[in-house]
Every structure is written in structure tokens, then in C-alpha cells.
């Protein structure tokens, strides 16, 4: 990421996990993601990982934290990027594509009552605000390598209650062959997105 320039396209694959989600008691959770950046001259893909955890949480809360952590990390570079954010969480994708604009128009209120995880939604909007983002949903546990890897990072973080402490050099390239030797049926790796096909979501809010 150190070579990424303003306007470059960044691909983020994020996932979340919560052990015992919805049950009574403290349910530990984690979130993780794979961040990819394509060097425009060499076509080399640079990959970084991040992961976080909470001792008592929910799936939706960790999905929001996966967004916040990813965008805070790339924003530390001081550049505004075009970002393709891929998640299997409809809560995130539909929220960012549809719900947030109406909530903000109503003063962060919704017709049906209180907004779940309101403060995290506000943090997510702030973290995202300087970037152009396309929010893309992908079916979970469907063999898409980058998404499966994000799931691996999230579930490991939840189980170990570990945190990456920022971006780490990715282990994706060594993880993929290990899965192919096991029982996981991985599909072909998603190619780095084409800038010409990038379609950012309409940003109907300000911060």
C-alpha cells in the first residue's frame, strides 16, 4: 500500500464472525479483510491483511467494524482511493447502498425505530467519506478465494481474540495452496477489478 497513489483502485474483501451469534451471554467475534492494490506500471498485486476481535459482540457489529478498520487503515496513507469493497454481509452492502442516505436525511433516524449499531454506522460513514466506493455483495462460503480468506481471518480472530494491530503483509498466497490440498473447494481467484468497470455507489451524504 505504500506505493498507492490518489485515485488508484483498491480491492477489499471483508468478512465477520461471531461465535454463538444471537445466543444469550458473551459471544466473541472477529472481523478480517484482505486488501489488494494493483501497481499500475508492473501489474503486480500487493496484498495486506487486517483482523480485529471483540469479546462480546454480534455479526452485524463486526461487519461494521470490518468496514471501519479497512477504511481507517487505507486512509492513513493520506490518499483518496477508488475502492471495490466486497462482502457477504447484506447488512453492509444494502446499508451503504440504500439505507444510510435516508437515515442521514432524517437526522440519523429511521421510520421503524432506533437504528441498530448507530454509533458504528456513523463511524463507518466517516471512515468511508473521502473515498469513492463500490459496495459489492458476494454469496458467503461459495469458494471465492479472497472472500474465503477474509472469512478465515475473521473466524481465527474470533476464536483467538486476536488483533493485527494495523495492516500486515498478507499470507493469502501461501494460504490458497494449503486449502487446495485439503477439503475446501476453491474457485478461480477473482482477477483484480478493471478500473473501466468500476461503478461507485452514489454518495448521498456528507460528513
Per-range role (PLM):
Residues 63, 67:
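Short, conserved alpha-helix that lines the donor NDP-sugar binding/gating region
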Residues 16-24, 28, 68-149, 186:
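RNase H catalytic domain
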Residues 69, 153, 175-178:
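Generic alpha-helical secondary-structure signal
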Residues 33, 125, 170, 174-175:
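Conserved "HGTGT" condensation-loop signature of ketosynthase/thiolase-family condensing enzymes
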Residues 62, 150-157:
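Stable alpha-helical structural segments in soluble proteins, enriched in small hydrophobic residues
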Residues 1-61, 72-73, 186-207:
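RNase H-like nuclease fold core
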Residues 114, 155-172:
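Acidic, His- and aromatic-enriched active-site or binding-groove loops in soluble protein domains
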Residues 172-185:
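Low-complexity, rRNA-contacting terminal tracts
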Amino acid at each position: 500500500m505504500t506505493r498507492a497513489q490518489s485515485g488508484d483502485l483498491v480491492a477489499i474483501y471483508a468478512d465477520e464472525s461471531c461465535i454463538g451469534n444471537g445466543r444469550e451471554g458473551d459471544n466473541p467475534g472477529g472481523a478480517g479483510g484482505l486488501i489488494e492494490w494493483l501497481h499500475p506500471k508492473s501489474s503486480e498485486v500487493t496484498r495486506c491483511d487486517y483482523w480485529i476481535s471483540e469479546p462480546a459482540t454480534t455479526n452485524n457489529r463486526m461487519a461494521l467494524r470490518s468496514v471501519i478498520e479497512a477504511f481507517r487503515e487505507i486512509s492513513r496513507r493520506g490518499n483518496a482511493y477508488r475502492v471495490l469493497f466486497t462482502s457477504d454481509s447484506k447488512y453492509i452492502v444494502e446499508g451503504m447502498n440504500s439505507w444510510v442516505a435516508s437515515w442521514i436525511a432524517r437526522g440519523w433516524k429511521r421510520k421503524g425505530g432506533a437504528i441498530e449499531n448507530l454509533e458504528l454506522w456513523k463511524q463507518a460513514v466517516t471512515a468511508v467519506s473521502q473515498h469513492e466506493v463500490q459496495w459489492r455483495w458476494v454469496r458467503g462460503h461459495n469458494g471465492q478465494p479472497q472472500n474465503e480468506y477474509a472469512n478465515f481471518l475473521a473466524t481465527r480472530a474470533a476464536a483467538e481474540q486476536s488483533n493485527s494491530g494495523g495492516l500486515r503483509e498478507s499470507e493469502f498466497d501461501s494460504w490458497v495452496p494449503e486449502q487446495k490440498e485439503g477439503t475446501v473447494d476453491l474457485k478461480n481467484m477473482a482477477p483484480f477489478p478493471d478500473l473501466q468497470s468500476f461503478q461507485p455507489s452514489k454518495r448521498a451524504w456528507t460528513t
